[in-house]
């Protein structure tokens, strides 16, 4: 259901390369001026011109603490991506705030509902968002039903057992809404399910399969060396096993790598030399080499995509919960001094073909 030409999707090409640009609107409002080769540049256009074909964006239900990642902000982001010639992956968090492989806090409006009520709410919300995007001419090409759903959807936490009857009901409700919207609006939309860190993929999808979660097109994996026990070879083995066992495409849908240990502000950075992989120095060249080798690993093992997380989360005067600036500026794809596009963007334009095993 995926095609390398934007915005419509058709047959699957060898590879999707892209980035999550959920921060761009906010960074620009905070005063960030992005450059490419020293000239003013739009990050969406930079992504496209360097060889990318897909943009990912997150959506929160009712984030009263911010005006970003709301429906209106996401509509603006998707519109910018499509205008730049990019396809769009819409990431439903099904939450009012960040959810990830540690926690899946439900939206406040759904927190006290029983499973049947939550399934209806999740289905209807998903369908409503997609119907509104269709009316605006901005349907995404791919939809994530949940973000890093290692714990149970709508309430689970790391280490807690998953009630798979409930979890399957919720996941299938979201999947059904995407399928219905796709049919109603006459546009193919691929469904992705997303798990953090490769070591968790096979156990989770085995459980999901046994519980009847079967109707999806893409397996998305977050891969960060800081939080994974696996090197690139280990990641490759998981990708190979997953696409063979489940018959789905497999993407590394989140990844990043630091290019410096320097700080541009007082926020503690999440990545750096403490999470570097052997052979990949924390430098602009090391960042580029990591992305090239990661993508080659994906391709060699039958995978279909790599998406960089938050290349646009640069340091600005704005405050976050963690301090002024960014916790990621040293792992962005724009430099700290001038927000000029880094050499790592060239990873997007390289030709990748599977190597014989």
List where the protein language model places each region.
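N-terminal signal peptide c-region/cleavage motif recognized by signal peptidases
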Residues: 3-7
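Acidic (Asp/Glu)-rich catalytic clusters
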Residues: 12-13, 42-51, 76-87, 131-139, ...
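N-terminal substrate-binding region of glycoside hydrolase catalytic domains
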Residues: 12-87, 93-122, 220
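Conserved, mostly hydrophobic/aromatic
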Residues: 19, 47, 91, 143, ...
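Active-site beta-loop-alpha junctions enriched in small/polar residues
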Residues: 22-24, 60-62, 93-97, 145-150, ...
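Aromatic-rich peripheral "rim/lid" segments of glycoside hydrolase catalytic domains that contact
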Residues: 29-35, 241, 260-293, 297-302, ...
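Glycoside hydrolase catalytic-domain groove-lining segments
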Residues: 43-45, 180-190, 199-275, 292-300
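Active-site cleft segment of glycoside hydrolase catalytic domains centered on the general acid/base Glu
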Residues: 70-73, 100-210, 214-216, 228-237, ...
């Amino acid at each position: 259901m995926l095609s390398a030409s934007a915005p419509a999707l058709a047959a699957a090409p060898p590879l999707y390369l892209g980035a999550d640009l959920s921060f761009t609107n906010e960074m620009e409002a905070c005063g960030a001026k992005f450059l490419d080769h020293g000239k003013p540049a739009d990050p969406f256009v930079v992504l496209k011109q360097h060889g990318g074909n897909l943009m990912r964006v997150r959506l929160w239900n009712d984030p009263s603490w911010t005006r970003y990642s709301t429906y209106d902000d996401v509509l603006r982001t998707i519109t910018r991506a499509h205008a730049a010639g990019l396809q769009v992956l819409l990431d439903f968090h099904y939450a009012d705030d960040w959810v990830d492989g540690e926690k899946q806090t439900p939206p406040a409006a759904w927190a006290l509902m029983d499973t049947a009520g939550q399934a209806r709410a999740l289905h209807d919300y998903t369908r409503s968002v997609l119907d509104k995007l269709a009316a605006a001419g901005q349907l995404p090409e791919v939809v994530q039903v949940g973000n890093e759903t290692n714990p149970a959807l709508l309430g689970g936490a790391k280490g807690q057992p998953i009630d798979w009857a409930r979890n399957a009901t919720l996941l299938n409700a979201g999947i059904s809404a995407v399928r219905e919207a796709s049919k109603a609006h006459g546009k193919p939309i691929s469904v992705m399910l997303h798990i953090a860190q490769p070591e968790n993929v096979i156990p989770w999808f085995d459980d999901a399969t046994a519980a009847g979660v079967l109707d999806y097109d893409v397996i998305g994996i977050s891969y960060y060396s800081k939080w994974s026990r696996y090197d690139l070879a280990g990641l490759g083995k998981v990708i190979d096993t997953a696409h063979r066992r489940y018959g789905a495409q497999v993407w590394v849908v989140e990844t990043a790598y630091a290019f410096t240990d320097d700080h541009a502000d007082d926020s503690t950075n999440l990545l750096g030399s403490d999470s570097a992989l052997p052979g990949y120095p924390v430098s602009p060249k090391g960042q580029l080499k990591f992305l090239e080798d990661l993508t080659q690993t994906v391709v060699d093992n039958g995978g279909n995509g790599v998406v960089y997380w938050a290349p646009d989360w640069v340091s600005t005067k704005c405050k976050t919960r963690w301090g002024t600036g960014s916790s990621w500026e040293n792992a962005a794809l724009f430099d700290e001094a001038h927000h000029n596009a880094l050499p790592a963007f060239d990873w997007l334009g390289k030709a990748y073909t599977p190597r014989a095993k």
